[in-house]
């Protein structure tokens, strides 16, 4: 009898815990994905803050030339970063207990791998939590689908690219200047600006900004007057009101006359789907492009391939980009390479005349 009562009490305790985890009445929804999301994101955030402030220099290239990234070692907010794990570690799983000492772990950039892996788990769980809350509330699942775009982008630069290149040292540093360095080196080695998927991503981000500004300005310009001149227009809306707060017919008419009739949406639902889908699809393509370039399927390189009928080279901007790529490749990791890979692969010119 005692055993049965204890089992019921434990079942009741577990049941109450399950109900609390999945309750939509909590001020912040936790969910089963949140059970994993909370500790992983807290770990990533805590280690990031500590390492950004106080981590010692890291031997990123594996050539015994440590690079400083923290504030206490001479950096500021702009130049500081979490330096990627050393090339000497490569793709090895490198938790603290795999190092001979904490000093060795810090020298080899262990915090970067710890932060990145916890962060990727955390944001993936955040996406799952979005779906979970939508499911509990009877909503459609597109919020999580939209969030999959930045998750895919982060996964591409922090995980897929290092896997393709063979080392976490090739991952994106966690800092402002480090991000710019990553972008420049990526262009030098993969010609990303000439990759169609990156072009689609640019169209997605810039187009999304344009469409967002157009939509916001159109709605704001066609509000239904509910206030006097002496009141803020925002006072004319009450949260939860059933009637429309702006005149979509007026907005449609304005935009249709500004450009042409069929450039303007006459359906609010299809309009908002378009506003969500455009940048999401663009960022999906960019993440896919990074993931293919990770394995050296690079952007277009015309390499003086535009010629006239006599076979003479017609110089184009693409050739200027190639020249810039070589310059950037020469300058990065100066002490790790004698020659940039593109130049080293070419036969030495004859000097015998």
UniProtKB/Swiss-Prot annotation:
Gene3D superfamilies: Photosystem II protein D1-like
Annotated pheophytin a binding sites: 126
Alphabetical keyword list: Acetylation, Calcium, Chlorophyll, Chloroplast, Chromophore, Electron transport, Herbicide resistance, Iron, Magnesium, Manganese, Membrane, Metal-binding, Oxidoreductase, Phosphoprotein, Photosynthesis, Photosystem II, Plastid, Thylakoid, Transmembrane, Transmembrane helix, Transport
Name by which UniProt lists this protein: Photosystem II protein D1
EC number assigned by the record: 1.10.3.9
Pfam families for this protein: Photo_RC
Site (Cleavage): 344-345
Post-translational modification: Tyr-161 forms a radical intermediate that is referred to as redox-active TyrZ, YZ or Y-Z.
InterPro entries cross-referenced by the UniProt entry: D1/D2 (IPR055266), Photo_II_D1/D2_sf (IPR036854), Photo_RC_L/M (IPR000484), Photo_RC_L/M_CS (IPR055265), PSII_D1 (IPR005867)
Record field: catalytic activity: 2 a plastoquinone + 4 hnu + 2 H2O = 2 a plastoquinol + O2
Subunit and interaction comment: PSII is composed of 1 copy each of membrane proteins PsbA, PsbB, PsbC, PsbD, PsbE, PsbF, PsbH, PsbI, PsbJ, PsbK, PsbL, PsbM, PsbT, PsbX, PsbY, PsbZ, Psb30/Ycf12, at least 3 peripheral proteins of the oxygen-evolving complex and a large number of cofactors. It forms dimeric complexes.
Residues that hold Fe cation according to the record: 215, 272
Binding site for a quinone: 215, 264-265
Entry's cofactor comment: The D1/D2 heterodimer binds P680, chlorophylls that are the primary electron donor of PSII, and subsequent electron acceptors. It shares a non-heme iron and each subunit binds pheophytin, quinone, additional chlorophylls, carotenoids and lipids. D1 provides most of the ligands for the Mn4-Ca-O5 cluster of the oxygen-evolving complex (OEC). There is also a Cl(-1) ion associated with D1 and D2, which is required for oxygen evolution. The PSII complex binds additional chlorophylls, carotenoids and specific lipids.
Gene of this entry: psbA
